[in-house]
Structures are given as C-alpha cells and as structure tokens.
C-alpha cells in the first residue's frame, strides 16, 4: 500500500514539475 501511494505521489510531483516547465 505504501509503495503504491509513493508511486502515485511521484507521478503527481513529476506532472506538476512538467506543467511548471511548460508555463515558464
């Protein structure tokens, strides 16, 4: 369960980083 949660958080964090790069 913890591994799945960490994976989801990782994907969300990477997605936010990509969006910030596109905006900037």
Curated annotation (Swiss-Prot):
Localization, per the record, is:
Cell inner membrane
* Cell inner membrane as UniProt keyword: yes
Induction (record text): Expressed in both exponential and stationary phase; expression is slightly higher in exponential phase (at protein level).
How does this protein sit in the membrane?
Answer: Single-pass membrane protein
| Top-level taxon of the source organism | Bacteria
Keywords for this protein: Cell inner membrane, Cell membrane, Membrane, Transmembrane, Transmembrane helix
Q: Where is it predominantly found?
A: membrane
Name the GO cellular-component terms.
plasma membrane
Transmembrane regions listed in the UniProt entry: 4-24
Q: What is this protein called?
A: Protein YahV
Species for this entry: Escherichia coli (strain K12)
Q: Gene that codes for this? A: yahV
């Amino acid at each position: 369960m913890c591994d799945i949660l960490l994976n989801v958080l990782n994907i969300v964090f990477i997605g936010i980083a990509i969006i910030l790069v596109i905006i900037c």
